[in-house]
Amino acid sequence: MAQTWKDTDISLDPIKDQTIAVIGYGIQGDAQANNMKDSGLNVIIGLKEGGNSWKKAEADGHKVMSVADATKQADIIHILIPDMIQGQVYKDEIGPNLSEGKALSFSHAAAIYWKWIEAPNNVDLIMIAPKGPGSKVRETYLDNFGTPAIVAVEQDFTGKAWDRTLGIAKAIGSARAGLIKTAFKEEVETDWFGEQADLCGGAASMVTNAFETLVEAGYQPEIAYFEVLHELKLIVDMIQRYGINGMWRRVSETARYGGLTRGPMVMDSANKENMKKVLTMIQDGTFNNEWISEYQKNGKDAFDKYMKQYDEHQIEKVGKEMRKMMWPDSTE
C-alpha cells in the first residue's frame, strides 16, 4: 500500500521561518500562493517584470519581485510556470541565483525527470502535486477542506526535504483531503499516460468516434451530441464519487446490462495493446523527444494542425449551438 498522510500528521513548524517564492501567478500559482499566505507562511512571488500577473499578485497582498530576486531571497523556490518555459527560466534567472541548501519545488516533475532543468546536487528537489485545477485548490481550501495531492522527494540534500514537502502540502490545504507518496518518475509517466490514453486523448477520441457512428447511421447530430457527449459528465461524476461498481449500481438495469456486456466489445484487448504502446513511448522518451522537437520548431503553433481537426469537426459545430441552449451566457 502507498504511504499516506493526513493533516494531523504534519506540522508547519519546520517551514514557519522559511521564505517560499512562488514562481508564476497563473491558476495554480495564484491558488497555492494565497493558500500558503492564509496559512501563515512567508510567501513572495517571482514574476516576469511587467507581466500581466504582477498587478494582480500585488492586489492580492503579495510582495512581488523578479524571478531572480525571489530566488535569492527564498529558502524554497516553488516553480509553477508552464512546463515548456521552466528550463529557460531556470537557466536565465533561477539557476544563477540558487545557493546551497535551498529547495526547488514543483507541482509536476517533468522538468527534472527529463532534465529540462539540471539541478545541482546541493539543493532539495521536492514535489507537491494537487490532483485538481487551481480553482478547486483555492475553493476547497476556503471551504475548510482541500484538494488531495501526491508528494515526492527526489533529492534530500538538507535532510529536511520531507518536512518542506509535507509542510507546503499542509499549507495549501491538500493534507486535509489526504496525501499519497509517489516518485518523480511515477508522477511524470502516469500523469502523461492518463492525459494521453484516458482523460484527454482517449476520452475525446472515444466520444468523437461514438458521435460519428450515430451520425453516419442517420441519426440527428443534435441527438447524437446529447447521448454521447453531454451525458458523459453524469457518468464520470458517479464514477468519481462512488467508483466504477457504484456507477453500475446507480444506472438503469438496461444501461447496466448493456454497458457490462458491450463495453468490452468497444474497448477490447486491441485497445489495451495500443495503450501499452502509448505508455512505452512515454517511458522510453519517444514522446518527450517528439514534443520537445515540435515545440522548439513551432512553439504553440505545434498544436494547430491537430486542433484544426476538432475545430472543423461536426461535433464542435453542433456542440457550440447545443451549449448555447444550456449556457446562454457562455462566451466560447
Swiss-Prot record:
NADP(+) binds at residues 25-28, 48, 53, 83-86, 134. The active site is at 108. It holds the Pfam family KARI_N. Residues 183-329 form the KARI C-terminal knotted domain. Keywords: Amino-acid biosynthesis, Branched-chain amino acid biosynthesis, Magnesium, Metal-binding, NADP, Oxidoreductase. It comes from the Archaea. Mg(2+) 1 binds at residues 191, 195. It catalyses: (2R)-2,3-dihydroxy-3-methylbutanoate + NADP(+) = (2S)-2-acetolactate + NADPH + H(+); (2R,3R)-2,3-dihydroxy-3-methylpentanoate + NADP(+) = (S)-2-ethyl-2-hydroxy-3-oxobutanoate + NADPH + H(+). SUPFAM superfamilies: 6-phosphogluconate dehydrogenase C-terminal domain-like (SSF48179), NAD(P)-binding Rossmann-fold domains (SSF51735). HAMAP family: IlvC. This is Ketol-acid reductoisomerase (NADP(+)). It comes from Nitrosopumilus maritimus (strain SCM1).
